[in-house]
């Protein structure tokens, strides 16, 4: 039988057979397109409440011999009953802790990810480093040409130059020799379990975020170019807009959306 345990900085924090190390919640949330999370709660009399230091402590969840989660606490809090709760993010978030300098790259897709990880690993401590694992995402020509004139965190750089253009998913594997980062076109683990409402599906919740809805927008193009007194072409701060082709208005709007929620 595989026993689920939780460790904080190598110290046992939860074991189902030790009543003094009881917890009230350990809920993992997997996100294929983002960073996995863990919600951990423990009662006021847990002996190691003070051992979890947000952004510093390493929280590891094991099932049998396998590590199923590793990460850090982002925040902590307590409720009316003094139950303490921590929200944790997985080790993939370590890629937010390093900066990629401006770069220009020509070569293979694998080579760019190797470059990103090399820069990251040189900038962070041992526990935040990754080895490059399996790459099943491909480019038709096996040749890419990317550059960036700005600094960006490593995770954003990977998403911008690889995931957003070539697709795929990042997956962290926890091995005896360290963390391995895979870049996969599709996940290589398939569940044979069926989903049955009332049996293993107890609740369904749908949330729609309307804060990003736009009823009207102002399209702007490139900056206009003008000629100065010396007949040199210079770039002005004025942008090309749609006024000349939109009845004198520089905006467009969704009539149905405006009627529903206003401007």
Name the predicted role of every residue range.
Residues 1-51, 89-93, 256-263:
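Juxtamembrane "anchor/assembly" segments of surface/extracellular structural proteins
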Residues 2-11, 59, 181-183, 217:
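Short polybasic amphipathic segments
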Residues 189-263:
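Acidic, small/polar-enriched beta strand-loop surface segments
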Residues 27, 37, 117-148:
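N-terminal export/assembly leaders
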Residues 47-133:
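Surface-exposed cap/loop segments at beta↔alpha junctions
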Residues 110-114, 155, 159, 216-217, ...:
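Extracytoplasmic/secreted envelope proteins and their assembly/folding machinery
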